[in-house]
Amino acid sequence: NRIFALEIDHSNPDIVYFESNGDLFKTNDGGLTWSEIGDASFQSEDHNVKDIVMHPSISSELYLSSNRGFFKSTDGGLNWTEIMDGEFQEIEINPSNALMLYTIKVVDNRTEFYKSTDGGNSFTIQTAGWPNPTGPNDHQERVEIAVTPANPSLIYANATGSANGGSGTYGIYLSQDEGTSWTFQCCGGQPAGPPSLTNINMMGWDKEGEDDGGQYYYDVGLAVDPVNPDKLHLGGVNHWVSNDAGVTWVCPAKWSEPAEPGYVHADIHDIRFFDNELWIACDGGIFMSTDGGTTMNKCQV
């Protein structure tokens, strides 16, 4: 069975939550036994859970996004309150203010960015500078967001979709004011468009970013270095790195170059930092780096 969302208790690693095939499970004994959790109302809905996030200091408080809405639990997942209905994607918590949450909603052919300042009890949409597909064939339905303790006011967004005659990377966006407003960082002078050396597509198979399309609906990842707020790691088919806040990007090693020290298997789904270790989950397993991604090592799992 595929697992689409997982969270580990920050204070007790024996407590783990995960979603599989629309059901939510919890273990209290390090995975020896599992129980399906959620009240009757929650379990009655066919959830496609996209993210589960735990409050950084209150382990009984959880946030969950799914195709059915944005939910909050205050009792370790036994009961869930729907905060917003609709289809939601990723959740992030401000690194210096646990009352401030961010999440992404999908509406028709676009995404919307929502911000909470009261611990996820209510949200407001923030539209200034956010991707806005307007053409008859344009769409922008997937976003990964990332934050960093190095600068808690920053939020990066990796938006994918199609516009202006090209598809794949729709744009890299940056907020410097906790999501109130956004600026377009990359690539080229407009969202999407035909790929070229000056308008690269990081969702495709090409190391130079000159091929159109890719798997921008399937493998999308983003993380910010915990020490350097200008350094980003992005995942699509390949692993990409930016050292200037998302303006320019390089691919250290193509998916088909396993001999290169920076090689990561194709189809990246998640990128995370644990302290200063970089971890990447992909269709080839898990890769880890202790030098900021210069050298990637495959983990034996």
What residues fall within each predicted segment?
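Extracellular glycan-interacting surfaces
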Residues: 1-301
